[in-house]
Amino acid sequence: MESLVNKNIILGVTGGIAAYKSAEIVRHLKKSGSSVRVVMTASAEEFITPLTMQALSGNRVSTELLDVEAEAAMGHIELAKWADGILIAPATANTLARLSSGRGDDLLSTVTLAFNGPIALAPAMNQAMWRDSRTQGNLDSLIGNGFTICGPDSGEQACGDVGLGRMLEPIQILDIFSSLFDKGILLGKDVLITAGPTQEPIDPVRFITNRSSGKMGYNSVSYTHLRAHET
């Protein structure tokens, strides 16, 4: 993750059970040579304390949009100008909906609106919420607006369900996020990606197919759209 050296990174933490993994993300970012400032939503504070994130990042944690002290210097604009990149992990279904609609009703969403640079989201939610057509519509909108989606993973969830919706492990998220600062050979290239199952006819009646979920193609789109001229 050499591309993160000397980068100013905002880590957004929202209110999901996976918020505890955000502490490890801060640790990895610092180890990679990044300066980290953490922005937490009110619900995130129910899962992990600002004091923990402050101790790990070495910087004051921002939580309030209407913070009198911070807004004396237009805090949300100052944060947006300071950052080289924004990573929101975990990104709940509510967060995806808020960002997709362009709402700016808390500090994190307002900073995101004011920021002009790479933004990555690491979704974390129940598998039914992930499959919901409205969530998928929000994801399509976010990808269309230049957001990078990291994951999610499939497996057992905190509620006991099994399926897509688990947040990727911190190191997996950071592998994707760091690549946003290293455009490499795809810069200026047009990329075509296919996803999902295919069918190859054997005869007019029968065909060979596979059980592809499209997950690999979906993640490939997230990986390439900021590195290519058109994906």
Language model features: what each stretch is:
Residues 1-42, 121-123, 206-222:
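N-terminal phosphate-binding or glycine-rich loops at protein starts, especially the Walker A/P-loop
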Residues 94-104, 129-132, 202-209:
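Glycine/threonine-rich flexible loop motifs
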Residues 154-191:
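Glycine-rich phosphate/pyrophosphate-binding loop and the adjoining helix
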Residues 224-231:
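Conserved small/polar residues in nucleotide/adenosyl-binding loops
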